[in-house]
């Protein structure tokens, strides 16, 4: 899964990609091609 600053280009990679909000984060999921998964807004580790 990629961590990206913006998911704007990530949602256009494949026609089946969807943007989903879970627990305050935005995810791109793609069931037909799972390598296109991405997340935006992850916590930084200290």
Swiss-Prot record:
One of its GO terms (molecular function) is structural constituent of ribosome. GO terms for biological process: translation. InterPro entries: Ribosomal_bL36, Ribosomal_bL36_sp, Ribosomal_L36_bact. PROSITE patterns: RIBOSOMAL_L36. GO terms for cellular component: ribonucleoprotein complex; ribosome. Keywords: Ribonucleoprotein, Ribosomal protein. It comes from the Bacteria. Signal peptide: none annotated. It holds the Pfam family Ribosomal_L36. NCBIfam families: PRK00831.1, rpmJ_bact. HAMAP family: Ribosomal_bL36. Belongs to the bacterial ribosomal protein bL36 family. This is Large ribosomal subunit protein bL36B.
